[in-house]
Curated annotation (Swiss-Prot):
Binds 2 heme b groups non-covalently. The cytochrome bc1 complex contains 11 subunits: 3 respiratory subunits (MT-CYB, CYC1 and UQCRFS1), 2 core proteins (UQCRC1 and UQCRC2) and 6 low-molecular weight proteins (UQCRH/QCR6, UQCRB/QCR7, UQCRQ/QCR8, UQCR10/QCR9, UQCR11/QCR10 and a cleavage product of UQCRFS1). This cytochrome bc1 complex then forms a dimer. This is Cytochrome b. InterPro entries: Cyt_b/b6_C (IPR005798), Cyt_b/b6_C_sf (IPR036150), Cyt_b/b6_N (IPR005797), Cytb/b6-like_sf (IPR027387), Cytochrome_b (IPR030689), Cytochrome_b_C_euk/bac (IPR048260), Cytochrome_b_N_euk/bac (IPR048259), Di-haem_cyt_TM (IPR016174). It is a multi-pass membrane protein. Its cofactor is heme b.
Length: 380
């Protein structure tokens, strides 16, 4: 039989083993679609970002007007910018659902895959943050000022660290220039880490909704899951395009239509919606260093999840108590997101503190406890 180039060519066989002949569990649900959706989000963001970078000027006097120029005078510039800005929102929606799937179905027990995923999340958050500063509107400027200022909470070297990050004594031209450089670089770093993430995943193969070995029943990725991924893609792109074309500024802040002014502070400084949960946790602690540590812990806690798994079953499919706790956590995160968008006053302060406390309690205390309890129930 003639050799199949798909299976023998050094480059094509890597693609073949990852996307065509990959043995995949026969029962993975739509919750397993988000990996491919994230890959498409990344490609979309890199392409639209590249086109935007061709028309952008990373200078404090020109940044705001260069973005306005892109939207007004560049062919389809408005479309490229709206796709890029709202693409970030969909990127985060997909990554949150992807992480939620991992939590629910115990995918975190593939430790290397999970840890590289957490690194990807952190890199994505960094990329989104530096990107938000680039249009140099009011919220861009003040968001950059507030968040970079948090480094000053580091004992002894804090102030030096902040001035080093700023490239001066305030957020100014050097800050914008380096943020643009980082925003251009990081998506390619994300693409690199994604390949590592997939390499680790393909070492073990995919998990499945039952949490049991699927070695006895695997099917090829193509055509079964390639077509399923394309369906998922159309289902994601429909609301994405609806948002980007019909209400592109829905998720943005009106303050960002005003050019950055260091002399005027906006009444409410808040980040984009996808950072609000962490922002609420940061604000719920009335101490700078404590807040910064809580902020870091709110994401880094994901690294502890594999060690807090006490159940004899991998997934939550047959664990109603853990399921209840999981959805409680989801509701808790929605409350934190809402609190992050509210002013710092009664009753929002106490609600935020309660929600922050319950966030850490659910993950660190209640999940292991309920897992152990369910093991005991199994014996009766």
């Amino acid at each position: 039989m003639a050799p199949n180039i798909r299976k023998s060519h050094p480059l094509l066989k890597m693609i073949n083993n990852s996307l065509i002949d990959l043995p995949t569990p026969s029962n993975i649900s739509a919750w397993w679609n988000f990996g491919s959706l994230l890959a498409v989000c990344l490609i979309t963001q890199i392409l639209t970002g590249l086109l935007l970078a061709m028309h952008y000027t990373a200078d404090t006097t020109l940044a705001f007007s260069s973005v306005a120029h892109t939207c007004r005078n560049v062919q389809y510039g408005w479309l490229i910018r709206n796709l890029h800005a709202n693409g970030a929102s969909f990127f985060f929606i997909c990554i949150f659902l992807h992480i939620g799937r991992g939590l629910y179905y115990g995918s975190y027990l593939y430790k290397e895959t999970w840890n590289t995923g957490v690194i990807l999340l952190l890199t994505l958050m960094a990329t989104a943050f530096v990107g938000y500063v680039l249009p140099w509107g009011q919220m861009s400027f003040w968001g950059a000022t507030v968040i970079t200022n948090l480094f000053s909470a580091v004992p002894y070297i804090g102030q030096t660290l902040v001035e080093w990050a700023w490239g001066g004594f305030s957020v100014d031209n050097p800050t914008l220039t380096r943020f643009f450089a980082l925003h251009f670089l990081l998506p390619f770093v994300i693409a690199g880490i994604t390949i590592i993430h997939l390499t680790f995943l393909h070492e073990s193969g995919s998990n499945n909704p039952l949490g049991i070995s699927s070695n006895s029943d695997k099917i090829p990725f193509h055509p079964y899951y390639s077509i399923k991924d394309i369906l998922g893609l159309t289902l994601m792109f429909t609301p994405f395009l609806m948002l980007a074309l019909f209400s592109p500024n829905l998720l943005g802040d009106p303050e960002n239509f005003t050019p950055a002014n260091p002399l005027v502070t906006p009444p409410h400084i808040k980040p984009e919606w996808y950072f609000l949960f962490a922002y609420a946790i940061l604000r719920s602690i009335p101490n700078k260093l404590g807040g910064v540590l809580a902020l870091a812990a709110s994401v880094l806690i994901l690294l502890l999840i594999p060690f807090l798994h006490k159940s004899k079953q991998r997934t939550m499919t047959f664990r109603p108590l853990s399921q209840t706790l999981f959805w409680l956590l989801v509701a808790n995160l929605l409350i934190l997101t809402w609190i992050g968008s509210q002013p710092v006053e009664h009753p929002f302060i106490i609600i935020g503190q309660m929600a922050s406390l319950s966030y850490f309690s659910i993950l660190l205390i209640l999940f292991p406890m309920i897992g152990t309890l369910e093991n005991k129930i199994l014996n009766y």
